[in-house]
Amino acid sequence: MKRFISLAFIIICWSCAREEGPPPNILFIEVDDLTAKYLGCFGAEFAKTPCVDELATSGVVFNNAVVQGAMCTPSRNSLVTSLYPHNLNLYENLDLKSLPKGIWTFPKALQKEGYKTIWVGKNHLIPNSLGIRAKNPVDLRNKALQIEMGFDEVFQSLGRSFLIEIASKQLNDEGCWEMGKDAYADFLFENNLLDTFLQEGYTFPSSLDPNSEYMDGYFTSIAIEKLRKYEEKEPFFMWVNFSEPHAPFTAPSEYTRMFSEKNMPEVIDPDCENFNVPKELKPNPVPETVKTVFNYRKRYMGSIAYMDTQVGRLTDFINTSEFRDNTVVVFFSDHGIMTGDHGVLGKNTLYKEVLNPSLIISYPKEYEAQRIVTAVELLDLGKTVLDIAGASGETINNVPNGNSLVPLLNDQGLFGGNGIGFSEIRGVRSAFNGDYKYIDHPKTPILFNLKIDPDETLNVLEKEPKVAASLKIALDQWLLMSASNPDKTGNNTN
């Protein structure tokens, strides 16, 4: 069992052990609202995810990773800044208009390490645009991502759900299309596809071409084309963000037809719960009937299958290109969603379906395929990529929070974390060590023994008070340390 020692010693060990040579390229593939139990590599026999599964076969799979925020904006902005939601006071999507000016981000740190940084796809980062001059909203968002977040090149959209609202309102209010509200919307308008997009709206399925016109197919094509033309001497960090499998689940029909009620996973029945679950854990109760859950899951699984195809297009390009042996591929979701389990749909809760980000890191040249059971945090990726990039110990120590995953990836040195992952929604936090999850609800504290209750239905706090007390202490210490350290303001310089 790995013992835990200081981060400084870990960095020394890794620096001595790694081979000399140019640092690798780094490709992030981030998807939206993906629940790990719908992937074959996480045990779903019914799944149609061969491309992600293949990536897992060649990579390191983190069985017990957790996200820090349980909605898109909190999770993504926590990751890019290495700050927790409580540091940012960001628990729900609309809590914060923008991050503090000049905030630290790991892409800015990668730029200082000589990386070319590229953003492609859906954007839920909220950079501060104060003082930035731009000709239209797209230009402003692009420049803010470049200046405040640390990206040299940007192609981004707000995502399908926001886009429908933007396009509908603009056409209804203005009567004609004004370019510059959203880059993907402009693409649809220029190619006479906007009317089709808006007529379909939230309906199912989409008739747009899946690989060139549908949002994620278009993002994938953009990413591949940028890589195909990449001739820079410096290594690249590319962050590709898919909108799928986020609602409204409008994947092309051939993907949804793959699924029937026979191959649906069983629903975790809320009647199995032995305690009154606090309302904070059930923000969106399931409406209507079991049929609602079936239709919801069928469309969701179709969106996942479509997402998998786009992941495959991207990884196939990498594997058949000059980048094959020198690119680290990191696959993950910002969080998962509830699909009827515990009587809940959606997110913003602390059940495992939402908290596991399906984290996979593949770099066969250096990291042997394996499964890691140590609990880690998605926020750990900040220090991890800087470690992979060969950044100095001082640079890595300046990262506000988290621990490098490199010692787990290459089995050299010792992991600096304590094997506990922390997550938060407004007013409620959880501590998870792989075997147990403690939820620090002010009125109803909860302890799940995941060894005997993987579905999280039985509160065993009274039966195992010592375990609960231990995780409560760890949670309080984490909150104190992450809140009191002066570097946690996020305003430290790069």
Where are the regions that the model predicts?
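Formylglycine-dependent sulfatase
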Residues: 2, 16-439, 455-473
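Short hydrophobic beta-strand that contains or immediately precedes a catalytic carboxylate
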Residues: 447-448
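A short N-terminal helical cap/helix-turn-helix that marks the beginning
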Residues: 476-479
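Short, charged, surface-exposed hinge/linker loops at domain edges
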Residues: 484-494
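Sec-dependent N-terminal signal peptides
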Residues: 4-13
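Compositionally biased regions
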Residues: 7, 402-405, 483-485
